[in-house]
């Protein structure tokens, strides 16, 4: 273990099942620097479940799905928030912490869902469906949130839709999430045509092949997957719900139909279980690295700003969600 740098060595135990000792020195220097920079700047790192293990397990202070990160962002006492995730997540953290410095390590960390709809699209939808509330997935820009009545995540979408007490809602931008929620509620849902480039690639045939190759495997699917995939799965839920399912049920053999690193991170927490790992990478999440987290903290790079008129309205939509 002589290759392990001393001050980061205690963290290696968390990831040694995935990162060979020979590779650790490539990470350890950045990890040491990040830990020091966090102390110097009173900074906190919020990391989404899709971040790679060396980020998720070694430098992150708060981890979780979009809903968990939004809630935790509200209560942090740090002066600086680094969002190890994609841009809409950093914007949400800024909306909830307007007086704090929020950094995103790479400005190119976008989202296919967020790119699928604009504020003008929502204004046109409101003209077409006057009086129908707009429920917007948090996987959207601040401009889109500002045109919405309330936000939701994959973990609370059904509760949000039903909390409005109306017979019909517009739910955007994820078409598959909207269809999967529509199957669980009597509320009529008008959907948009956005898709997650990770989850839309899973198919029912994939599940059948997994079951054939790995008898007894329990299949967990994210609700951004197509409805026919969700129907073939044993369970569907947000990344937090999938993690909770594994923790609670302890399936001996399990597959998570979501982004690759989610399986890596949960598997590290459950070495007694067998994880089958079909790998659909999110290229946007993978733009976040230890090196650019370090640079963001060292140079105060990529400060997230939101135009005040947009921020106030977008914040209201997020706060309404958090109040449900």
From Swiss-Prot:
Binding of iminosuccinate, residues: 48, 66, 137-139, 154, 222-224, 239
Known function: Catalyzes the condensation of iminoaspartate with dihydroxyacetone phosphate to form quinolinate.
Annotated metabolic or biological route of this protein: Cofactor biosynthesis; NAD(+) biosynthesis; quinolinate from iminoaspartate: step 1/1
A Gene Ontology BP annotation from the UniProt entry: 'de novo' NAD biosynthetic process from L-aspartate
Catalytic activity, EC: 2.5.1.72
Reaction(s) this enzyme catalyzes, per UniProt: iminosuccinate + dihydroxyacetone phosphate = quinolinate + phosphate + 2 H2O + H(+)
Positions with a binding annotation for [4Fe-4S] cluster: 111, 196, 282
Keywords: 4Fe-4S, Cytoplasm, Iron, Iron-sulfur, Metal-binding, Plasmid, Pyridine nucleotide biosynthesis, Transferase
GO molecular function, one term: quinolinate synthetase A activity
Cofactor binding remark: Binds 1 [4Fe-4S] cluster per subunit.
Annotated family: Belongs to the quinolinate synthase family. Type 2 subfamily.
Main EC class the enzyme belongs to: transferase
Gene3D superfamilies with a match to the protein in the record: NadA-like
Entry's Gene Ontology cellular component terms: cytosol
Subcellular location: Cytoplasm
Protein name: Quinolinate synthase 2
Named cofactor requirement(s): [4Fe-4S] cluster
Organismal lineage: Bacteria, Pseudomonadati, Pseudomonadota, Alphaproteobacteria, Hyphomicrobiales
Keyword Transferase: yes
